[in-house]
């Protein structure tokens, strides 16, 4: 069970869209998208090498267009997908990048340092390796093919390999992927655009200014972004700048924010009014209030993301992965420094760059890895990062003009993706073999950290009781008073530790309650807030949290500030505990560990006392 995020009227800040979502539903969606991408890749390869290969080529070169008066505009199917539809892909990437740097994982510099530096090395080292094979000439211009990792395939590969305790390495790789995307976008904008036409460029700048002002419109901001986005695409196309960057530009200018208390409560009031007196006026007001309580960035990701994952990217694979793999093509590719440069850049360059940078950051003390994340696991993830598909094939099409050399580069990308998967699989399997996994969940994964954990009792107490629970769980020991009896029995001989494990499927308000407790903890009021939350388990709505914070002795303005502005710090404190619980395959609350060993059996005070007494002996 992993923490998920809900867009609800409870109003606490949302989790990052790509980094911190760990729900089974989200993972299933990611895996399905990766499977669909792989399916269409295979279809394209089979089609291009079948007796019907001519129909594949004919489809790609089919012209689609429109005209009015003396003006006509048309594109081939391939360019329609690569230059028009892929704009939506880069739009989603831009939204995610904006979010992560504004309110997401990359706002926490200490956590982001290692994956950010590793990502930068994972961009630079592959390019250097590629240029070692292709130091000059037209081939050298294709260095951008090897700099990017395909996030969809990366997530899917990790799901197929199933390494031991994947949560930490998955989060690390997704953080890395955001920076990887930024580097790829910069490379496309700077190095892979045609000669610039000044007139259309001036128009594009004017459209960008208009886009920056859209956020101040009182209504119809969505349609305004759409219309101006199309205008920007046309202006960039005419200016000689790759038009897909219009998607990035629009995304970067769309505001993103964490939901604030007043808009959320206003939405709740509107819904309550509609419930009491259903009519069209109240319905419109409630709908508008709900929309405005969530940033346009969030709404756009929700609206456009599925279409990108399940329609646009599979179409992109279909029109770009159809490489002729006959004997002559393969022999030409085997002798081509372009092919070998792509393979070496992605497979070796990514691995050396990411692993080496991570080792260097740890060695110099400039960064730290999350608990349970080892360099061996980073190495496995670094190997999988050599799966460079979507943006790699995209850059092949714009960096190389000769069709024969394009096929050589595409063969390199496909071969590198297969080799990177096998390489990553081998590293994870060897790692698990060298460090044989113990029975999952039998022992406490992360030792007690008095400076970090929420504890009661002496740090050097001979007995330790760790509880993973949530504030909505009616059976959690703290709620039933069992822990108080146990502490009273052992006195200073017992150290009690609370860790978060919000079971949202059963307890939908538990995650918000956990975050509220961490906001109170920043004022030294964790246990007071926990007491209030347990005492009011049936009333854990958003508005209730502030009332409980006051009762716990919190400064309410500081509490509100900590929840909203410092949301990443509060968030990580909860998700760290939840990821530990997932890694131990915990599935119920409360789950207790007696002196580091999982307690099995009743959790009433008498049973816990007997278990602890046995541990003393």
From Swiss-Prot:
Residues spanning the membrane: 33-53, 75-95, 113-133, 141-161, 171-191, 194-214, 234-254, 304-324, 340-360, 378-398, 411-431
Record's catalysed reaction(s): Na(+)(in) + 2 H(+)(out) = Na(+)(out) + 2 H(+)(in)
Pfam families named among the record's database cross-references: Na_H_antiport_1, Thioredoxin_4
Cellular localisation: Cell membrane
GO molecular function, one term: sodium:proton antiporter activity
A biological process term (GO) from this entry: regulation of pH
Chief place of localization: membrane
PANTHER family given in the database record: NA(+)_H(+) ANTIPORTER NHAA (PTHR30341:SF0), SODIUM ION/PROTON ANTIPORTER NHAA-RELATED (PTHR30341)
NCBIfam families, A to Z: NhaA (TIGR00773)
Name of the protein described by the UniProt record: Na(+)/H(+) antiporter NhaA 1
Organism whose genome encodes this protein: Mycolicibacterium vanbaalenii (strain DSM 7251 / JCM 13017 / BCRC 16820 / KCTC 9966 / NRRL B-24157 / PYR-1)
Primary gene name: nhaA1
